[in-house]
Amino acid sequence: MNRTRSASMVQGGLNWDSLPLKLFAGGNAKFWNPADIDFSRDRADWERLTDDERSYATRLCAEFIAGEESVTQDIQPFMAAMRAEGRLGDEMYLTQFAFEEAKHVQVFRMWLDAVGVTDDLHHFLDDVPSYRTIFYEELPDCLNALTIDPSPAAQVRASVTYNHMVEGMLALTGYFGWHKICVERGILPGMQELVRRIGDDERRHMAWGTFTCRRHVAADDANWGVFETRMNELMPLGLRLIEEGFALYDPMPFDLSVDEFMAYASDKGMRRFGTIASARGRPLAEIDLDYTPVQLEDTFADEDARALAAV
C-alpha cells in the first residue's frame, strides 16, 4: 500500500487530548526500566517458602510470563487494523503498548532468574487446560483474524479477548494473587515492585481496549451485541481457569481462597459491561475525548489500594 499523506502534518496537527494520545503521553511520563528493580532480597524470601508455596508461586509466574509473551506477539494485527482505519494516534499508542508487553516478559524472566527458577516451566500449564484454550487458541485466533477482517465487529471481539478477558479479568486477578502472597506477608519486595509497575502499564492497555469498544458501539449499536456475546463466551472460561489452578492444591498455599478469587474476577468482568454500554447512542465525536475508560481502571486500582491498606 502506497503512502499518500501524513496524518501528523494535516492542518491543526494531532489532537493531544484524544484518549489514545493521552495514554501515549502517560506511558512516556511513566517509563521504567526492569533493570532498575532490585530483586536481591527476593531470593532469601523465596528459599524460606514451603515446597507447595514455591510451586504455586512458580505456576502463577509461569502463567504470567507465557501470557505476556503471547500478547507481545498477538497485538501486532491490531496495529495494522488501526493503520488501515487511518488512526495514527491509536497506532502510536499500540507501538508503546507492544513495547511494554515485551518489557513485562523481560521483567518476569529476570525475577525467575533472580530466585533461581531456571527449569522448563511448560508443565505448569498442562494442568490448567483452560489457560491453553484462552492464550494458545482464543487469543491468537481473535487477533490474527484482524489480518483478514479488520472490521469494527472483529476489533470488538479481539479487544474483548485481549483487553477485557486476558488483561481486565485474568491479569487483574493475578495481581490480586501476588498482593495476597507478597504484601500481606511482607515478602518478595522485588515482585511487589514488579507488579506495581506492570499494573500501571496494564491499566492504560485496558483503558485503550475499553475506548476501542466504546467508539465502535457508539458508531453502530450492533457492536454492543458483539461485545456482550463475546464477554459471555469468555467469562465462564476465565473463571474455570481460576478453579483449575486452585484444584491442584490441598491445602491451598498461602491460605488463598478460591471463593475470594472467583468473586474478584467476576466483579472485574461484570463491571466492564456498564462502561461499554454507556457509549450506546452517544455522538461518536464525544467518545474520543471521554476519559471514562481511564477512570474505570483508576477506580479498580484505588479499590485494591484501599483493600491492601486495610490489611
Swiss-Prot record:
Residue positions binding Mn(2+): 68, 101, 104
Output the superkingdom of the source species: Bacteria
Q: Where is this cross-link: 3-(O4'-tyrosyl)-valine (Val-Tyr)?
A: 71-162
Q: What EC number(s) does this enzyme carry? A: 1.-.-.-
Q: Transmembrane ranges? A: none
What the protein does comes down to:
Probable oxidase that might be involved in lipid metabolism.
On assembly, the entry states: Homodimer.
Q: What is this protein called?
A: R2-like ligand binding oxidase
Q: What is the organism field in this record?
A: Mycobacterium avium (strain 104)
